[in-house]
C-alpha cells in the first residue's frame, strides 16, 4: 500500500518532535513510563466489564463484553520496552480488539516490569497467565496479540509452550516485532534516520550514535542476547501457529519481522507479512491512519471471528 498523505504528515510531525528532543529521549521515556505506571484512571466503556485476577506474582485483567458473540479469546501482551505496566491506553486497545473480533473476551497480562524485575520474570508471568487462561478457554480459540516487546514475548511464549508440550494458541498477531535484543538486523542501520520513535536525527551519523541504536536494554543486562527466549529471532519457529507480522519500512526493527517471516515460511507455517511503505514503529496504534484501517481489515479477513 502506497503511503497515505495523512501518514506522511503524521510521520513528519513525529520525526520533528521526537528527533528535536533526541538527547533527552531516554530520560523522557523513563519519566513517562513512571508517570504512566502510577496512573489509575481507567473506566471500561459501556457494554464491557473488567475483572482483575491475581495470577502468581502478577495480574490478569479480563475484559468481557456484556454481549459475548465470538468464541475467540484474545490473549494480549502489551509493549512498552519492558518498563511500562498495563496502562489505560492498552486497555482501550484491548477493547478495540474485542470489537474487531465480534465481541471477543480479552485477557490483558499485567506483567511485572523493569526496574522491579528483569529477564526472565516478565516472560514467566506471561507464560503462567496463559496457562491460567487455558484452564477456562480452549487454546484452539485463543489469538495472541503483542506489539514491540509484547510481540517479543508472544513469540517467546509460543516457543516455551512448544518446548514444554503445552497447547499453543490458534494464531499470533505481531505488531512491530522486536525479536532481536542485540539489535543486529540490517534495518537498525538502514532506518536509523527514518523511525520517529527509536531513530536518530539526520544531524547525527549512524557511527556516532551506534551505541545508542544497538542499545542493550537494562532488562537484559548480563544475559545472553542470543537466548531464543530473550531474542526469539534466534530460535526455532517449528510447529508454530498461524502468524501475522505487521511492520513498516521505516521501523528501526523492520528486519526482525523479515527474519521471523523467513523462518516461519521455512518451517511450513501459515504466515503473513504486511510491510507498509514508510510506516513507523507501532503505527497501527493510530487508528485514524488509512494504513491502520487497512491492516486491521486484512487481519480480520484472515482470522475470522
Language model features: what each stretch is:
Residues 1-65:
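A glycine/proline-hinged amphipathic helix-loop "lid/cap" segment
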Residues 9, 17-18, 51, 55-305:
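Alpha/beta-hydrolase superfamily serine-hydrolase fold, recognizing
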